[in-house]
């Protein structure tokens, strides 16, 4: 069963932890790709200098952050990669969760082809570990791009999260990645991951 709007309507830090173990579903050419969410980061615009919406900053790019909980915010980085976030709390609050890593579950050959243009059996050990172990890596592997920006995960048939009961794990809380510019916010323990999962991007 897919997650509903009510599930997403909570503090980003709470949602980031509760999304761990849930399953991201992405339909590509009629084939459903599935991956367990194993790493997330929370961003809270009002108080978070690492957020694109810090201090109420509002631009055309960041407008999805102010949308309804359950909306996708997909942004472009380094001129070639995408990152996928899910909006949380309430409309206008600019809170969201970055999906940092997935554990591939279903249709892994297509996931592999999208990521490396190879069958999964052709991948070396390094490639297998890195297939979805990072925010831009999972976007490549699950064909998530700017077309998915603003997509409503509560209504979409091609991008949503399933409420699957993978809950037998310990959650690690630590600092977020790549935000050294964010002053005191770089020390917030707002990154969450499943302990000992092989697909976590940074431990």
UniProtKB/Swiss-Prot annotation:
DNA repair listed as a keyword: yes
The protein's enzyme class: hydrolase
Alphabetized InterPro entries for the sequence: Formyl_transferase-like_C_sf, MPG, MPG_sf
Keyword vocabulary terms for this entry: DNA damage, DNA repair, Hydrolase
Gene Ontology MF: a single term: DNA binding
One GO BP: base-excision repair
Keyword flag DNA repair: yes
Record EC number: 3.2.2.-
Membrane-crossing segments per the record: none
Protein family membership: Belongs to the DNA glycosylase MPG family.
PANTHER family in alphabetical order: DNA-3-METHYLADENINE GLYCOSYLASE
Protein name per Swiss-Prot or TrEMBL: Putative 3-methyladenine DNA glycosylase
Source organism of the structure: Clostridium botulinum (strain Loch Maree / Type A3)
């Amino acid at each position: 069963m897919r997650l509903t709007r009510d599930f997403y309507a909570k503090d980003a830090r709470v949602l980031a932890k509760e999304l761990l173990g849930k399953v991201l579903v992405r339909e590509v050419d009629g084939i459903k790709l599935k991956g367990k969410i194993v790493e997330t980061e929370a961003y809270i615009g009002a108080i978070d200098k690492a957020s694109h919406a810090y201090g109420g900053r509002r631009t055309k790019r960041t407008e999805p952050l102010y949308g309804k909980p359950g909306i996708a915010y997909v942004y472009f980085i380094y001129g070639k990669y995408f990152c996928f976030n899910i909006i949380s709390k309430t409309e206008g609050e600019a809170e969201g969760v970055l999906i940092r890593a997935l554990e591939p579950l279903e249709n892994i050959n297509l996931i592999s082809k999208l990521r490396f243009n190879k069958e999964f059996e052709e991948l070396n050990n390094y490639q297998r570990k890195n297939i979805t172990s990072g925010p831009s890596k999972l976007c490549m592997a699950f064909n998530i791009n700017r077309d998915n920006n603003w997509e409503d995960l509560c209504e979409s048939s091609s991008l949503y999260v399933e409420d699957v009961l993978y809950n037998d794990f310990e959650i690690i809380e630590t600092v977020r990645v790549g935000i050294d510019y964010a002053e005191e916010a770089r020390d917030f323990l707002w990154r969450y991951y499943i302990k000992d999962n092989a697909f976590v991007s940074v431990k």
